[in-house]
Regions:
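Extended acidic, low-complexity intrinsically disordered regions
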Residues: 1-389
């Protein structure tokens, strides 16, 4: 229903009031307080020589360039794919989106967005000016559409093929005779594109196996179809922090500190890690962590053992200890950065619930998928074969 009415899905797996009540309350408050438009229509137009090929988001398609939106809100994102047919005689190309809607006060309004872009005759300026983050987000939306229209396996295959197509054209156009055949040649603007593509393939929405239930998979795909560029990238490449490396000033400055690579190779069980993956945050407690550090985060457990049962329903307190101040300061900075409440779950090293942490280590081999290094090697071989044809 939400896919044609402009709505959204909020998924609370195995709902527990002691764990999820705050997240549910926050979601309800945001839905009722955010700016919302009603009975809206969105028309997208483009210059002669450009053709609208596909649309992504939650809406009802009235025509190729006209989308009906029973509701539209400030959290909604829509994307369109434009195909170039013939721009040989033009010097610029224009795109325009017009949104007609009714406000909650009953006022009928229209918002118009217009962009004019220069036309290049060579590939160099195109690859130099491409928005790599937008490309990755659109790729995720295309994969979600492919999975819904066909199969998840088809979406994974299409992701690899798309990456090979983009990079093989670049290599064929810009590599030199001195470039080693085994070297992966990447444009600067798309250096993160292979990692983001692997992040999509390993994302629970597309991951192979029966460990992801249907409800979660559908909810995640809905989020990808309607998410903003920043929201999608935070899902594909979560941010990982070592709490002991987070500065004490984070509570005062609200500045998000540098992140770690998404690989377990250099992780240790003697600390506490914080993983931020867009709509959720995970606090991973190492079993070898300093008891003083754990006590500063959890407080006095009154003799209760630190195990999975305790952690599962634990509500993170705000304590006057350095570790608690740093942790809550970091979580507050992350929430401020994404502009919304971020539900936090605690997991203990080695427990089944910690799988939510390990599955976000995109650079590792996991779930039957290759590591980042293995993925790059496989992609490079496919590029070599494609360029030789």
């Amino acid at each position: 229903m939400v896919t044609v009415t402009g709505g959204a899905i909020h998924h609370f797996a195995g709902f527990r009031a002691d764990r999820d009540a705050l997240a549910l309350r926050s979601a309800i408050l945001r839905v009722t307080a955010r700016v919302t438009g009603w009975e809206a229509v969105l028309r997208v137009r483009c210059s002669k020589g450009l053709v609208l090929e596909a649309q992504h988001g939650h809406f009802f398609v009235r025509a190729a360039d006209l989308l009906a939106l029973p509701t539209v809100d400030s959290d909604s994102t829509f994307a369109v794919q434009v195909r170039v047919e013939d721009l040989s005689a033009a010097q610029s190309a224009s795109l325009q989106a017009a949104l007609l809607y009714t406000t909650s006060k009953g006022e009928r309004r229209i918002r118009v967005f217009t962009v004019a872009l220069p036309i290049c005759t060579t590939l160099a300026p195109l690859y130099r000016s491409v928005d790599g983050d937008a490309v990755a987000a659109l790729t995720a939306k295309m994969a979600a559409k492919k999975a819904l229209d066909a199969k998840v396996a088809d979406a994974r295959e299409a992701l690899s093929n798309k990456l090979v197509d983009v990079l093989s054209v670049y290599r064929a156009s810009f590599s030199t005779p001195q470039t080693p055949p085994s070297q992966l040649v990447l444009p600067d603007a798309l250096r993160s594109y292979p990692l983001h593509t692997l992040g999509i393939i390993k994302h629970p929405a597309f991951r192979a196996g029966a460990d992801v239930d249907a409800d979660r998979r559908v909810a995640l795909m809905a989020h990808l179809r309607t998410g903003s560029v920043d929201a999608i990238l935070s899902e594909l490449s979560p941010r990982l922090f070592d709490l002991q490396q987070v500065p004490d000033s984070v509570a005062d400055t609200a500045i998000v500190p540098p992140t770690l690579n998404l690989s377990s190779e250099k992780l240790t069980n003697s600390t506490v890690y914080v993983l931020h993956a867009g709509t959720r945050a995970v606090v991973w407690l190492g079993r070898g962590a300093d008891p003083q550090l754990l006590g500063g985060i959890l407080g006095d457990l009154q003799g209760r053992p630190l195990d999975a049962n305790l952690v599962a329903g634990f509500s993170l307190p705000r304590l006057p200890y350095a570790a608690s101040v740093r942790l809550n300061g970091l979580l507050d900075a992350l929430a401020l950065d994404v502009g919304r409440f971020v539900p936090v779950s605690l997991v203990l090293e080695g427990d089944p619930a910690a799988a939510v942490f390990s599955e976000s280590m995109v650079e590792d081999r996991s779930g039957g998928a290759a590591s980042y290094f293995e993925f790059l090697v496989a992609i490079q071989k496919q590029i070599q074969e494609k360029v030789k044809r």
